[in-house]
Amino acid sequence: MDIRGTDTPLLDWSGEAIALGIFENETALTGELTQLDEKIGGTIAELIEEAEFEGKSGSSVATRIGGKSPIRKLILVGLGKKEELTLETVRLGAATVARLGKKEKVKTLAIQFPVVDNDAAQTTAAIAEGMILSLHQDNRFKSEPEDKPLKLETVDILGVGEQSEAINQAETVCSGVILARELVAAPANTVTPVTFAETAQNLAKDYGLDLEILEKDECEKRKMGAFLGVAKASDLPPKFIHLTYKPSGTPKRKLAIVGKSLTFDSGGLNLKVSGSGIETMKMDMGGGAATLGAAKAIAQLKPDVEVHFVCAATENMISGKAMHPGDILTASNGKTIEVNNTDAEGRLTLADALVFAEQLEVDAIVDLATLTGACIVALGDNISGLWSTDETLAEEIKTASEAAGEKFWIMPMEEKYFEGLKSPIADMKNTGPRAGGSITAALFLKQFIKETPWAHLDIAGPVWADKENGVNNAGATGFPVRTLVHWVLK
């Protein structure tokens, strides 16, 4: 699909289908829409009247254009109230257009939406993202793909100018999102710690990233007892992955992104039982997948920021070598942990990863993890929890998420709740009381950061969509690659 920006007037464009964004309660035709309506035989006014189209957010309607018009299809998309227009409105509207264009089997399409905040570049990028991500289908594991090959070949975004840089950036970011989606969607017999590390190797080779992979013996030398405690039950070797993007000049900032990378989580000896969603636990490396997705995008966009990508990849399995409930592990910072639940393993792998990241002497660390069901209970499937020791960092991420159209909610770091993690025989337990479980998980991770500004993103809900939702089709979403990229770029 070739996406292009253009100043070609609406009345001069020729192709198969035109998509128009309409504000709520502003369906009366004026200006060039009146002229276009006359050109195509009154189809716009007729469609608005017959469909009782009001322009409400999320609404859409399409029809065939009769007569001798070279334009065969018309698509109207509701953008909601004019004063509430955002980049996300445009992004979601573009996703609707893309799906309707595919359904209507058009090859060439023009889309005309209003420019948000007089920023044609950002508006163009949002439209491109909405179209690319909504049309992505992962058919790798089907013998006969359900969908026929995509018909949509060319999309012209009208009224924005050429905008090749904005479109290229959107395509690059989407390539990172799609990598994350495909890693999360792939089963655990395809994406293992070994193949996950191979993905990192391919990124390093293709995009000029520095790569260090610590094998088990090196992790032992570094005393990563928390990470290795989780890893020891698996027949597959753990892989501690460290990718680095370095700009050509002096970096204005150094950042670290740390992703939880459990390629499968059985729960360990605290085995996940029937009804617990064990079959979905291939997605427990969603944080690591997004970390590699962000690495792919950032390496191509080349910001003047040094970024370290850290993934402690392993499985949480059962065997005679498995860690027991009640075991005490020692992390690489010397902190001891009583394992009172082997199914709270992600935080154990992150503990050593955070210690490693801080030793890189970066200016800020962000970790992301499908960490707790408690966060889903609190915020649902569409919103990620955000905890931080630094107010400025939290606001940076929140701002980046709003630009990306990915939702975060800043959560409390209630220090008193750490009382629930105290152990009589170790420095802490790995889980606390049921109440406030996502907060105690964040407090646990905080014990492995000394002074560096740090934020924790619990992405357990948004990493997967059970049904079509916005720019996401059912399946892995690639959340929050776009937020991470926006954060680094800004």
UniProtKB/Swiss-Prot annotation:
Binding residue positions for Mn(2+) 1: D265, D343, E345
PANTHER family with a match to the protein in the record: CYTOSOL AMINOPEPTIDASE, LEUCINE AMINOPEPTIDASE-RELATED
Family in the record: Belongs to the peptidase M17 family.
Swiss-Prot/TrEMBL catalytic activity: Release of an N-terminal amino acid, Xaa-|-Yaa-, in which Xaa is preferably Leu, but may be other amino acids including Pro although not Arg or Lys, and Yaa may be Pro. Amino acid amides and methyl esters are also readily hydrolyzed, but rates on arylamides are exceedingly low; Release of an N-terminal amino acid, preferentially leucine, but not glutamic or aspartic acids
Function text: Presumably involved in the processing and regular turnover of intracellular proteins. Catalyzes the removal of unsubstituted N-terminal amino acids from various peptides.
EC number: 3.4.11.1, 3.4.11.10
Primary location: cytoplasm
Matches recorded under CDD domains: Peptidase_M17
Needed co-factor(s): Mn(2+)
Pfam family, one: Peptidase_M17_N
Binding-site positions, Mn(2+) 2: K260, D265, D284, E345
Active site: K272, R347
Protein name as catalogued: Probable cytosol aminopeptidase
The organism's place on the tree of life at top rank: Bacteria
A GO cellular-component term linked to this record: cytoplasm
Keywords: Aminopeptidase, Cytoplasm, Hydrolase, Manganese, Metal-binding, Protease
Cofactor note: Binds 2 manganese ions per subunit.
UniProt-annotated location(s): Cytoplasm
Coiled coil: none
Cystine bridges: none
Enzyme class: hydrolase
